[in-house]
A protein has these predicted regions:
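Short His-Asn-centered micro-motif
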Residues: 51-53
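A positional/architectural concept
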Residues: 32-37
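A short, Trp-centered hydrophobic/proline-enriched beta-strand micro-motif
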Residues: 14-29, 68-72
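C-terminal edge-of-domain segments
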Residues: 115-169
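Short active-site oxyanion
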Residues: 45-49
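N-terminal leader/targeting segments and the immediate start of mature chains
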Residues: 1-20, 157-158, 165-169
Length: 169
């Protein structure tokens, strides 16, 4: 993997860890369904991990169609991430132990041994992120300038990155 690809993956991980809350989108027949999910980890390979109830609607949907989208948004910093990938349920006591947090007892009262608990691992295929480094005042000025001039406002190309994931090592 090139240095640039490593830097992009690192920046993507930083954004996800900072934002933390994702909207996980799954397919339900002809409809798309989204729900908020707290990210537990972005591992060294770029896989994204979540805790879930094994018998929830989302896990049933993933069993039928593993293609998901994860959307992260932080309006305060103008940071946005969209990830397309393949989701799967993972039953790994060691991984559960590694990722476990006491707050999870609210959803899994039996703790780490809760029989209804599963992990969802999302292996990204592609991702895009927008991370505007300009302050809101600078952006507002540029937007106002575009309106006055009758031109379209365009963010700089460096603020929009598209990363194709390579998980074949």
């Amino acid at each position: 993997m090139t240095t640039t690809k490593n830097q992009e993956r690192k920046r993507l991980r930083e954004l996800i860890e900072k934002i933390e809350l994702a909207m996980m989108v799954t397919s339900h027949g002809d409809e798309l369904r989204a729900r908020p999910m707290t990210t537990s980890q972005v591992d060294e390979d770029g896989n994204i991990w979540f805790f879930s109830n094994e018998f929830s609607a989302k896990t049933e949907e993933i069993k039928k169609d593993q293609q998901v989208n994860l959307s992260y948004a932080d309006k305060s910093s103008n940071s946005y991430v969209s990830i397309s990938g393949t989701a799967s349920m993972v039953h790994d006591p060691a991984k559960i132990n590694e990722l476990w947090s006491p707050i999870l007892k609210a959803w899994f009262p039996n703790g780490k041994d809760d029989p209804d608990m599963t992990l969802i691992r999302v292996v990204p295929h592609s991702s895009e992120f927008w991370d505007s480094s300009a302050s809101k005042m600078v952006q507002l000025f540029k937007i106002s300038k575009a309106i006055i001039k009758g031109e379209a406002y365009h963010e700089q190309a460096s603020e929009d990155e598209n990363i194709k994931q390579d998980h074949d090592k």
